[in-house]
Design a protein with these regions (language model features):
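Post-Walker A helix-loop "phosphate-sensing" segment adjacent to the P-loop in P-loop NTPases
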Residues: 84-94
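Hydrophobic positions on the alpha1 helix immediately C-terminal to the Walker A/P-loop
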Residues: 78, 82
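ATP-dependent NMP and nucleoside kinases share a basic, alpha-helical "lid"
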Residues: 155, 159, 211-260
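NTP-dependent small-molecule kinase module
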Residues: 2-58, 242-245, 255-263, 279-318
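Conserved nucleotide-sensing/catalytic segment adjacent to the nucleotide-binding pocket
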Residues: 93-94, 101-208
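Hydrophobic anchor at the beta1->P-loop junction of P-loop NTPases
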Residues: 65-67
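Conserved lysine of the Walker
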Residues: 75
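Walker A (P-loop) phosphate-binding loop of P-loop NTPases
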Residues: 72
Length: 318
């Protein structure tokens, strides 16, 4: 039976073992919960005919699928289950983590995000002729307290609003862009895979400065490259055939990050701003997704997704 015939045949989800393989991000420890399995089953039933169609059109019989969403959406767990389903059908699948491709390790990137925000904020004050040494002294105190991104700081100080707006604008121009992430390297990797190249070198990036290397990976027999990544539906990313979007909210993302607590300071006003910008970018890119899954595990069309996003945004501002 060919791969396309397998995908078009009746399917029942296999029983998962206690542990299944996950992505290639160094140091990741993944727990698979029943909710991941349930959502993956829903997605897989809709994905199978789409994947069969894409494979039939592929010159080298290779397809790239991405699973994207905020960090609380269950990307890694759901992508791991999808990969297991494909392998159980005898379809060669490699699960790739996009988190290997930022330009800086997490700690350094967090510092760069803050630098971008603060430099732009100061320049915004200068541009509006609102900068004074006294206000700079107040800002230094806010920097030490790490609350200069807190909207409450601007309630009685209009100049702080100028600072925050200018900083947020610059931050939005950095987050999820080629300045932060090496999209060119990922794009080249996807192109090489789809063109039939078997030996590829995949980047590995840990959380320390010297945790950086490349692993040779043999893609012989791999028909599906499954990319698990927040930016898997980005306008800077090329070569994804079937992007899947998992819906989440900034509040869920924050709760997920607090549960992991890998880098500290994750419930700060600045992190809240980062997550809000991230969600806006995901919403902006959502129209390109081939499948959208709600937080409750239901498939959505784009119009329904936008309705949920707008409702969530309005409730968040009340």
């Amino acid at each position: 039976m060919t791969t396309i015939e397998k995908l078009n045949a009746p399917w029942e989800p296999p029983q998962l073992p206690s542990e299944i393989p996950h992505g290639d991000m160094p140091g990741d420890h993944i727990s698979i919960y029943p909710d991941h399995v349930r959502k993956a089953e829903t997605l897989f039933r809709a994905l199978r005919p789409m994947l069969a169609s894409q494979l039939s059109q592929s010159a080298h019989g290779r397809v790239v699928i991405s699973v994207c969403g905020g960090s609380g959406a269950g990307k890694t767990g759901i992508a791991s289950v999808l990969a297991y389903f494909l392998r159980a059908m005898g379809i060669g699948t490699y699960l790739l983590s996009g988190d290997n491709y930022p330009r800086r390790i997490p700690q350094d990137n967090d510092q760069e995000r803050i630098r971008v925000f603060r430099v732009a904020g100061l320049r915004g004050l200068l541009a509006e002729d609102q900068y004074t040494p006294e206000r700079m002294a107040e800002l230094r105190k806010a920097w030490e307290a790490e609350n200069d991104a807190d909207p409450q700081q601007a309630v009685e100080r209009p100049w702080m609003k100028t600072y925050q707006q200018a900083g947020r604008k610059a931050l939005a121009q950095y987050l999820g862009t080629p300045g932060e992430t090496d999209f060119d390297e990922v794009n080249q990797l996807l192109a090489s895979f789809k063109q039939g190249q078997n030996l590829v070198y995949l980047k590995r990036m840990g959380r320390q400065f010297d945790e950086l290397w490349y692993d040779p990976v043999d893609m012989t027999g791999i028909e599906v490259l499954l990319l698990e990544w927040t930016h898997g539906n980005s306008e800077y990313l090329f070569g994804v055939d079937l992007p899947i979007l998992l819906n989440s909210t900034p509040a869920q993302t924050l709760a997920h990050r607090m549960a992991r607590n890998r880098d500290g300071k994750i419930d700060s006003p600045f992190v809240a701003m980062v997550l809000d910008i991230e969600q806006q970018k995901l919403d902006h890119q959502a129209h390109k997704a081939k499948l959208i899954l709600s937080r409750e595990g239901e498939l959505l069309d784009y119009v329904s997704y936008r309705g949920l996003s707008i409702d969530t945004s309005e409730r968040g501002t009340r």
